[in-house]
Amino acid sequence: MNDDIEPGLRRRIRQDVQSMHAYAIQESTGMVKLDAMENPHRLPADLQEALGRRLGALALNRYPGSRIDTLRAALAGHAGLPEGFSLMLGNGSDELISLLAMACDVPGASILAPLPGFVMYAMSAQLQGLAFHGVDLTPDFELDEAAMSAAIRAHRPAITYLAYPNNPTA
């Protein structure tokens, strides 16, 4: 954090959070941003217009209410989830990763993931005060199954991320 922060605010923010660095967004002019799952092409004009009409007809000034249950059930059916299982929906992967870390924030808990990988795995662990254990991919950016298994046995993490292929290696 910046040294210009008001002293009263500095006392309220954990030291480990103050020492964190901002998420760096690399210059990408002229590049296809595969690491951010962005489509380099705009939607066709007719589709943009149709989506605009549909979005304009929605009651965006209200919470979804029971409509979220209908959406969740439809998505679970489409994914073929077994009875008794559910989906967790959120505003993007950062929010879902943070919520999982928050839910598992108990003394001694940790998070484990392959490296390099999605930066939010380690960042969410740090923000929640959880230990993060990274396991290096092989030199060919393949999952090192033996190293992952050994790390899981050694650390017994509350969360093990296996997003593979992952961001930014695939």
Give the ranges of each region predicted by the language model:
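Conserved core of the PLP fold type I
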Residues: A59-A170
